[in-house]
């Protein structure tokens, strides 16, 4: 299979900008966002800024996996454009049924086009960077077997997302932590540093007090992961906190020998 005939498929939780999607010829299936006034398609008719505005107004939008119809539509488009194979890198199965949906449809299409579906065990830019690196590898001529058997599993195993939240309210409402923990954490200004566990579930790996300590801890943990590696892809993003994101980015640029760093704010990029 010629590398240029390999299609990349992901979902909207990869948080890739329209420019990145277009330049890398990536096919994206939107997750569904359930709001008080109806259902929306993530990245199509609702965006990060809209969701954060609703949260500030007291609403709690719910996410749902992409519809079967939208996933099938993307696969039909890939086939119509003449691709010989599909690599799908989806949102962590620990958070969503998107990966399992893609696997089911891949099985149904096995006689039409080969599809390898990967559980990113991550989300947002952790997932997105894996997709972008796979796109670069395809452009550089990496073949199907090398990509699917070695490269992408290695990328997934060596992706380390870290993030924090300013309030524990939404983790509590989403069932990620208990109400008592949320109340105590709020009173003490405790901010968890969260990552993805080996099974793709969210996991708290540190707790600090105050927003400034959050930024320092995020930088320290990122530096530890980078270690002495000569090349790594590094991205920063924010959920309605662009000023804090920029501070983290600046700190990382001071302390890390960065090959690639992308400042992407889902709350502002439509």
Segments the model singles out, each with a brief description of its role:
Residues 2-7, 13-27, 32, 38, ...:
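Mixed-charge interfacial surface used for oligomerization/domain docking
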Residues 39-88, 92-110:
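Class I S-adenosyl-L-methionine
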């Amino acid at each position: 299979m010629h590398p240029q005939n390999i299609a990349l498929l992901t979902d909207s939780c990869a948080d890739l900008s329209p420019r990145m999607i277009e330049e890398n010829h990536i096919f994206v299936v939107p997750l569904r966002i359930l709001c008080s006034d109806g259902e929306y398609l993530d990245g199509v008719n609702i965006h990060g800024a809209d969701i954060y505005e609703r949260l500030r107004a007291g609403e709690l939008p719910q996410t749902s996996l992409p519809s079967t119809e939208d996933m099938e539509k993307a696969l039909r488009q890939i086939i119509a454009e003449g691709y010989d194979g599909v690599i799908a890198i989806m949102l962590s199965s620990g958070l969503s049924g998107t990966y399992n949906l893609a696997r089911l449809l891949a099985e149904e299409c096995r006689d039409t086009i080969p599809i390898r579906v990967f559980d990113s065990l991550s989300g947002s830019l952790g997932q997105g960077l894996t997709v972008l690196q796979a796109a670069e590898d395809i452009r550089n001529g990496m073949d199907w077997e090398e990509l699917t058997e070695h490269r992408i599993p290695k990328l997934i195993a060596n992706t380390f997302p870290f993030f924090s939240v300013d309030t524990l309210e939404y983790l509590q409402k989403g069932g990620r932590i208990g109400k008592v923990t949320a109340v105590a954490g709020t009173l003490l200004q405790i901010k968890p540093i969260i990552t993805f566990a080996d099974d793709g579930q969210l996991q708290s790996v540190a707790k600090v007090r105050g927003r400034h300590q959050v930024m320092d801890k995020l930088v320290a943990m990122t530096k530890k992961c980078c270690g002495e590696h000569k090349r790594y892809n590094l991205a920063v993003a924010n959920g309605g906190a662009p000023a804090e994101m920029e501070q983290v980015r600046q700190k990382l640029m001071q302390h890390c020998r960065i090959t690639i760093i992308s400042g992407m704010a889902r709350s502002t990029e439509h």
